[in-house]
Amino acid sequence: MSALGESNNKQNGKEILHNYVTKKLTSQPYSCQWIPTSCSVVTVGKKTSGGISKGDIKIHQLEFDDTSGDPKLNLVYENEFTNPFRCLSFFKQANQLQQQDNRKFITGDFNGQISEWDSDICDIPIWGVKGAHQGSISAIDAYADNLVVCGGKDGTIKVYDTRIKPNSANDNNGNNSSPISTFEQTNKSNCWSICTNDNNIIAGFENGDLNIYNLKTNSIQSTTKLNGGICSIDSNDRSNILNQFLITTNKSFISIASFNNNNNNNIEFKDYDINKEPNQTIWSGIYSPWNKKDNENIFTIAQGDGSVSMYRDDCKLIDKVLVSDLPILSLDYSKDRKGLLCCISLKKQLSILISPC
């Protein structure tokens, strides 16, 4: 395992990653993503009211103050729901920079329910499944316009097609909807992370298991074990997620992996130490959708010390910025405006970062 070098937050004397604006929230967000074709960010999480935990959805728009011209985050939507939310995903495309008309997103909550929302009018879900999992849904990923893959604390992974409407005629909350595929985990370890397209699923678990599933044959294609719980998985190519994917863990290391179906179904790993503390959690890692020329990949990670760090594909540190004094839980690149990232922290903060990469 390689160790990464120190950084002074500069590259050739210039700041690369900058904390542009931060706003304190009234609820604890657990996931954030940019709304396609907008300057708005949706956050989902938990809000405590009268000692009762409820679900919370907020939408903030990046704007500029009329007088000072300073950036600000303006709350344009907020609502409470019955169950606290754990995760969210917009529908990803094979070409991540392709203009997206689909502004719908999927949420997973702590009560095992998945719901589809229209980000323009998200007071009531337009589709959903109650009891998709027993207990919390820890990870969710959506692809194309209809494919939803979710993983839960119960150790199972389920695949849904939003074109299949609920059998119940009462509402769109899908009391009787069935998954099109289900994958069981023998040891029932919590599924923490999912990355999918219409061919494969890569799933990471709390106990370090990393499984690859084939959606065409509804079977497990490969399995291996890492020395740490797998917090997030992201691919540099959504059309072929197995070609190269980034794994972050709760043991202070990341791994850049690839799967060669012609190489005895083996997954090849390059592991890198990130933090000096041996058990610091790296909550999230994502590839930049913008920097693809000359086969150069750039990725950004959210760290347990409250910092956000940007790396080249060879794990050379580009820049690092301290955003909070508590862990960064989630981050996302804007697919419409190059250089914009959003992230949330355990300190109930939403931050917008800017970078030329």
Swiss-Prot record:
Name the InterPro entries for this protein: WD40/YVTN_repeat-like_dom_sf, WD40_repeat_dom_sf, WD40_rpt
- Key word Repeat present: yes
A GO MF annotation of the entry reads: ubiquitin binding
Main location as per UniProt: other
Identify the SUPFAM superfamilies for this entry.
WD40 repeat-like
GO CC term (a single one): dynein axonemal particle
The WD repeat boundaries are 80-127, 132-170, 184-223, 277-321
Q: What quaternary structure, including any partners, is listed in this protein's UniProt entry?
A: Interacts with PIH1D1; the interaction associates DNAAF10 with the R2TP complex. Interacts with several dynein axonemal assembly factors.
| PANTHER family xrefs | MRNA EXPORT FACTOR AND BUB3
How is this protein named in the record? Dynein axonemal assembly factor 10
The species this protein belongs to is Dictyostelium discoideum (Social amoeba)
